[in-house]
Amino acid sequence: MSPKARRAAGLQGASAALVLTNPPFFEAGKMRLSPNAARAFAHAAPAAAKSDEPFLSRWLHACAALLAPGGRLVVIHRADALAALLAALAGRVGGLRILPVQPRAAEPATRILVAAVKGSRAPLTLLPPLILHEADGRFTALAEDIHRGAALIAL
């Protein structure tokens, strides 16, 4: 999103203390889209624009541009997109904290939460995973507390 487009949308650059984002997880044409137009738009990045820059990189560049110095960016994405996400954030934010989210303890992470700070030079930190379910399918105690608002996700 260009600075002009951000201003037209009422978004002032370098002013946000916190930007939370859930970018589209998939590229258009690489998955079967929902027949619901709003869902399809939310789940798949639009077809390539005039830019050679990947969609995720453009999305996160726009998010980072909204942050004031010291502002925090929090992103949720697919775990298999971690490399692309790190590449997109390189040079824009620092102090990255990565929280893998696993469906169950014995399964690999399917999602990641990434928090970063504009202007930080702190090193990347890989946090212990957030495990959502016990082997029997019940929520873990922490996941249950998070859902009920009794605990926070430590990022």
Please provide the spans of the model-predicted regions:
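Residue-level detector of flexible, active-site-proximal loop/helix-junction positions
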Residues: 2, 102-105, 120
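A short acidic, Gly/Pro-enriched loop at the edge of an enzyme's catalytic core
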Residues: 2-20
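Short, glycine/acidic-enriched loop or turn micro-motifs at the edges of active sites
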Residues: 3, 25, 118
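Mobile active-site "lid"/loop adjacent to the S-adenosyl-L-methionine
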Residues: 14-18, 23-58
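Generic structural "secondary-structure junction" signal
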Residues: 27-28, 43, 103, 126, ...
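Conserved Class I SAM-dependent methyltransferase catalytic core
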Residues: 51-109
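SAM/dcSAM-binding transferase cores
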Residues: 109-155
